[in-house]
Amino acid sequence: MSQSRLDDLFAYVEERCLWQFFSRTWDREENIEGVLNQVCRLLTGQEPLRGTPQERLFYADALAMANDVRERFPWASQVNKEEIAFLIDGLKSRLVDVTITRSTNRELNHHLY
């Protein structure tokens, strides 16, 4: 995996995507997985999942992100499906690490929420 490509994707998400900052750990995990799984499907030419309201919500965020990735990063159209999947998995891991694991926000896991 190209570290610079992963850095590009991470910088994009940090700058443009509010779904990574939902108020609870489980919300953040769900959004990171849901949106990025749909992004992966879109970037690899697979049909996105749209069977449930939640899948459609993830699809809406993923569609904007996938279009931006194609527009901003010329390499996105030059990599194969396996590399896209590998990059998205790396992005998920980095987002979980930064927004959940190393977060100092104590409300993420507060028992009253």
Swiss-Prot record:
Keywords: ATP-binding, Iron, Iron-sulfur, Metal-binding, Nitrogen fixation, Nucleotide-binding, Oxidoreductase, Vanadium. The keyword Iron-sulfur applies. InterPro entries: Nase_V-Fe_dsu, V/Nase_d_su. It comes from the Bacteria. Its EC number is 1.18.6.1. It catalyses: N2 + 8 reduced [2Fe-2S]-[ferredoxin] + 16 ATP + 16 H2O = H2 + 8 oxidized [2Fe-2S]-[ferredoxin] + 2 NH4(+) + 16 ADP + 16 phosphate + 6 H(+). One of its GO terms (biological process) is nitrogen fixation. Its cofactor is iron-sulfur cluster; vanadium cation. GO terms for molecular function: ATP binding; iron-sulfur cluster binding; metal ion binding; nitrogenase activity. The key enzymatic reactions in nitrogen fixation are catalyzed by the nitrogenase complex, which has 2 components: the iron protein (component 2) and a component 1 which is either a molybdenum-iron protein, a vanadium-iron, or an iron-iron protein. Hexamer of two alpha, two beta, and two delta chains. This is Nitrogenase vanadium-iron protein delta chain. It comes from Azotobacter salinestris.
